Structure formats: structure tokens, C-alpha cells
């Protein structure tokens, strides 16, 4: 009698654990439009690139000020730079973007996610926004992208600001 009761309790416990494990392993995808409507606030906008990709960006601050192009690090987004806006927006035009596969940009049409592909996206964004010269601010992976961009486009840069980044990769 006691053995049947213990077996029943153990069996029920195993079924409950199995159910919870299966439920937690299922990925419930949130529709992209729902995420965008929730998080694309304020100065958020989207640029369409030549290949049809849509890049999430913000263009804020003093439109007549010197331009800061802000690029986030790995697993980051343009929201990483939000705390700087109140301190810099009076004097600078601040352009930030979500790199492909990050933030609200998400997947891109080209399916290219290398550092060179990120650099090409930045070149296209800068061209679309008609920015001639700017200070490139890059954090972590964004710093490496900024450094590589600088090597190929020194004539476009007023300066390079790299935060917590390795220069290899």
C-alpha cells in the first residue's frame, strides 16, 4: 500500500516536471510589429537600404551641431546610448542605429552579419542621412567596427571615440 502511494507520488512528480520542461522549451515568438510598436518611441525611425533592409535609427539633438555617430556593441542596441542624450543633445546631432541582427533592426535582406557588412550598412546610412563629417563613437564590437570604418574612410571622420573595445577580429 505504501509502495503504491510512493510510486504514484513519484510518477505524478515526474509527469509535472516533464510537462514544465516541455512548456519551458517552447519558444513563443512575439510578432515584430508588436515589439516595434512597444519600443520604437520618440525619435525612433527606420531607413530602407538599397537591398530592402530596414534599419532602426535615431537622429536627435542639435541638427546644426557636430555629428556623433553612435554604434553599440554585441547584443546591444541604440538604446544603450539613451542616457547620453540629455547631456549631449544641446551641442551635438546624435545619430544612433541598431546594427543588423540587433535591436529593432533584426534580420536583414542580405543575411550578411560580418564586421564588413556592418561597415557597409553604416556607409549607406551615413550617405542616406547626408552626413559629410562626423565623430564615430563605438562601444565594444561597435568600437571595432568604428576602427575598421576609420581605416577605410578617414576623410569622413572628425574623430574616433572607442569605448571598451578590442581592435582585433
Residue locations for each model-derived region?
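Alpha/beta-hydrolase fold catalytic core
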Residues: 2-66, 132
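Active-site loop/oxyanion-hole signature of alpha/beta-hydrolase fold enzymes
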Residues: 50, 58, 96-137
Amino acid at each position: 500500500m505504501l509502495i503504491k502511494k510512493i510510486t504514484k507520488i513519484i510518477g505524478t512528480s515526474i509527469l509535472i516536471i516533464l510537462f514544465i520542461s516541455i512548456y519551458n522549451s517552447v519558444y513563443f515568438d512575439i510578432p515584430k510589429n508588436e515589439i516595434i510598436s512597444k519600443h520604437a518611441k520618440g525619435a525612433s525611425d527606420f531607413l530602407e537600404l538599397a537591398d530592402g533592409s530596414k534599419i532602426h535609427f535615431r537622429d536627435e539633438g542639435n541638427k546644426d551641431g557636430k555629428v556623433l555617430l553612435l554604434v553599440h556593441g554585441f547584443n546591444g542596441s541604440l538604446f544603450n546610448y539613451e542616457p547620453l542624450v540629455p547631456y549631449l543633445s544641446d551641442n551635438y546631432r546624435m545619430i544612433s542605429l541598431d546594427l543588423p541582427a540587433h535591436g529593432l533592426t533584426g534580420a536583414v535582406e542580405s543575411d550578411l552579419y560580418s564586421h564588413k557588412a556592418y561597415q557597409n550598412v553604416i556607409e549607406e546610412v551615413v550617405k542616406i542621412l547626408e552626413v559629410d563629417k562626423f565623430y564615430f563613437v563605438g562601444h565594444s564590437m561597435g568600437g571595432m567596427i568604428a576602427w575598421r570604418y576609420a581605416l577605410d574612410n578617414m576623410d569622413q571622420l572628425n574623430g574616433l571615440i572607442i569605448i571598451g573595445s578590442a581592435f582585433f577580429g
